[in-house]
Amino acid sequence: MNEISIAISHTPWIEERVASFQRLLGQLGPCEVMSFQDRMPNWAWSFLMWHWAAMEAPVNVTHCLFLQDDVEVAPDFWAQLRQMIAQVPYEIIGLESCHPAAPKIASEGIGWYTTIDGLVGPGYVFPRQLLADFIGWRKRELMPGAAVRISEDTLIGVYAMARGRKIYHPVPTIIDHDTSIKSSYLNDEHKHRRTLATWRTHDRSTLDCDASNAVHLGRFYESNHWLCRQYVYDWAPQRHWTCELDRCPEQYAEGL
């Protein structure tokens, strides 16, 4: 069985996030959680969190779950998460499935979509070995200053594009982002801040959850491949234009 470590980024100096953090712990149930709550720049706390999960978590851990303190999780979170990991054990799972096409995909009876860069920070899963590769890539294959300038979730999207990987997103998803709590990064007006298809709106058990049938939606963001060109060593022109052309199919692009 896959063993899962849990890391939660928490900002205890914001009162409403103290309450939401306690709510999340209650929803997760009895489990060992490592929280990262030192007041430091985005790039610094995220590196400490990733390093702990890849290098310091118990040796039997195979997958690393990352959550923010302002999310809620489904009542059957653990059972569903294990099923998802079993479907794509070697892939990154972006649990914040906030693509505008998510409700349409659910209405078509499909339980997954993929992007090449669409990871959003409130919740995601890394296979542990892949996380170690990501950390090495961050150290060796980025130009100086890149890790400081690029936010942690965008950096994972850049990594996925650089490695030619897809990110898998479940529909509906099993987390919900509580946007009644103000963003600690002033992202309150971000148009893709909230998941559009969760367990509250759709029943995943009625959908085709075979990940091999996932709908591929290509690039989620307009310019992440240009970040690759700017900051990734040996970013090949052919790879750049492959990403440029990997656009969301027209029938799923409304609202992007």
What do these predicted ranges mean?
Residues 1-67, 71-256:
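Peripheral/terminal regions associated with large enzymatic or DNA-binding modules
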